[in-house]
Design a protein with these regions (language model features):
Chain A
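Claisen-condensing/thiolase-fold acyl-transfer catalytic domains that form or cleave C-C bonds
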Residues: 49, 53-56, 60, 79-80, ...
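Anion-binding (especially nucleotide phosphate/pyrophosphate-binding) glycine-rich loop
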Residues: 62, 66-98
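Conserved small-residue
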Residues: 3-5, 31, 73, 114, ...
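Short glycine-rich phosphate-binding loop at a beta-alpha junction
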Residues: 68-76, 234-243
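Flexible, glycine-rich active-site loops centered on histidine and acidic residues
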Residues: 123-157
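Condensing-enzyme catalytic core mediating Claisen C-C bond formation in acyl metabolism
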Residues: 1-45, 146-213, 217, 221, ...
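Acidic-glycine-rich active-site phosphate/pyrophosphate-binding loop
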Residues: 24-31, 82-95, 132-138, 189-196, ...
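Short beta-strand segments
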Residues: 7, 76, 105, 130-136, ...
Length: 339, 75
């Protein structure tokens, strides 16, 4: 599998930490020191389909193909604008495509799960061109009265078009179920024949320390393993992209793997945690800024509710775009530098 | 016990960017201005250093309490 085209889209509305101070018992200092997040993009209305479609159209344009050339649409998402039809079907309509389309749910690791799925379809000869999208409206799932979690999230979408090739050098997917660490109950509906669950739905619930420890240790294990499968070490990678969940996780992984901060770009400070969208969003910013060169090795690692994780090593094959878009501060200082 | 104490003090000092000498067995975690993720990272550091599993809720009370927990787990 090779990445033939890439694109992304963010909602226009920016919500700063200061705006959160107005209705939550929190502070910019508290949020920044614990997460590295200073602002995030939040949808103004139910517009995930529109964002995912915009990201997809950019990826198709970049790949130089049209919707009719697609053999499959795979969307990694926790929940789209609709329970059904899938976001993938709604994108299919927008792209005037005629191929099979489905959503895939592996929380924040969804994009890498979807990449591996796409690679398998291509290797099996069942598809030539697959659109793989990570799209999340995670802010509408958050409990905006819980200051420990709602400050973390942002919305967005990133997409790639993949085709046959040898660019995916290694991949690892894991699942180790731990519901209590990170979960959100489904709405029970109003079925009169089913007793309501004892616990009322109340947005995202997270045991922060447990998730932090899982994320750091799993990401290190995954990165070491996918690098070794690719015949390299993590330290030999040109770029290491971590799911932008929390700057403290990224820093903890970087310190333990002794990685150069200049090889670990990030945008969490201005996007927040965009779940399955975070890796393709970051990759697209790097590509459009001209940072990605043909032949470069990129390790990617994501982790999330499940608990699940996914990691891979890609050999980048595309030339930089003709018109570059300077990326806004992709290398901000670590969050955990204490005065 | 002293060896564990000095390693815990070093790990704590590194996390806080302070001098290990300032940390004694009587030092209370509440007085160290650690946030929840500092505690998570400290536990990960100590689990790696001593090859033990530490219940994170036991990082409470004094540094000496944690040293005893690690010593018991290591036996």
């Amino acid at each position: 599998m090779n990445i033939l085209g890439i694109g992304s889209a963010l909602p226009e509305q920016v919500v700063s930490n200061q705006q959160l101070e107005e209705f939550l018992d929190t502070s910019d200092e508290w949020i920044t020191s614990r997460t590295g997040i200073t602002r995030r993009r939040v949808m103004k209305e139910s517009e995930l389909t529109r964002l995912a479609l915009a990201a997809s159209q950019r990826a198709l344009l970049d790949a130089g193909i049209s919707g009719q050339d697609l053999d499959m649409i795979l969307v990694a998402t926790t929940m789209g604008d609709y329970v059904f039809p899938s976001t993938a079907c709604l994108i299919q309509e927008g792209l005037h495509a005629a191929c099979p389309a489905m959503d895939l749910h592996a929380a924040c690791a969804g994009f890498i799960y979807a990449l591996d799925t796409a690679d398998s379809f291509i290797k099996a000869g069942k598809a030539q061109h697959i659109l793989v999208v990570g799209a999340e409206a995670i802010t509408r799932l958050a409990n905006w009265e819980d200051r420990a979690t709602c400050v973390l999230f942002g919305d967005g979408a990133g997409a790639v078009v993949v085709g046959p090739g040898e660019g995916l050098l290694s991949v690892r997917l894991t699942a180790r179920t731990d519901r209590d660490a990170l979960y959100m109950l489904a709405e029970p509906g109003n079925n009169p024949f089913t007793r309501k669950p004892d616990e009322a739905p109340g947005g995202v619930r997270m045991q922060g320390q447990d998730v932090f420890r899982f994320a750091v240790s799993q990401s290190i294990e995954d990165l070491n393993q996918v690098a070794a499968q690719a015949g390299r070490t993590v330290q030999e990678m040109d770029w290491v992209l971590l799911h932008q969940a929390n700057r403290r996780i990224i820093d903890a992984v970087r310190q333990r793997l002794k990685l150069d901060p200049a090889r670990m770009p990030g945008n969490i400070h201005r996007t927040g945690n965009t779940s399955a969208a975070s890796i393709p969003l970051l990759l697209d910013e790097m590509y459009r800024a001209g940072l990605l060169m043909p032949g470069q090795l990129i390790a990617m690692s994501a982790f999330g509710a499940g608990l699940v994780s996914g990691a891979c090593v890609l050999r980048w094959g595309k030339e930089p775009p003709k018109t570059l878009t300077p990326a806004e501060d992709l290398f901000s200082p670590p969050a955990n530098i204490k005065p | 016990m002293e060896n564990i104490m000095s390693k815990v003090a070093e790990a704590l000092a590194e996390r806080r960017g302070s001098d290990p000498q300032e940390i004694t067995a009587e030092t209370r975690f509440n007085d160290l201005a650690l946030d929840s993720l500092d505690v998570a990272e400290l536990v990960m550091d100590l689990e790696d250093a001593f090859n033990v599993t530490i219940d994170i809720t036991q990082v409470d009370g004094t540094v000496g309490d944690l040293v005893r927990v690690i010593q018991e787990a290591a036996q």
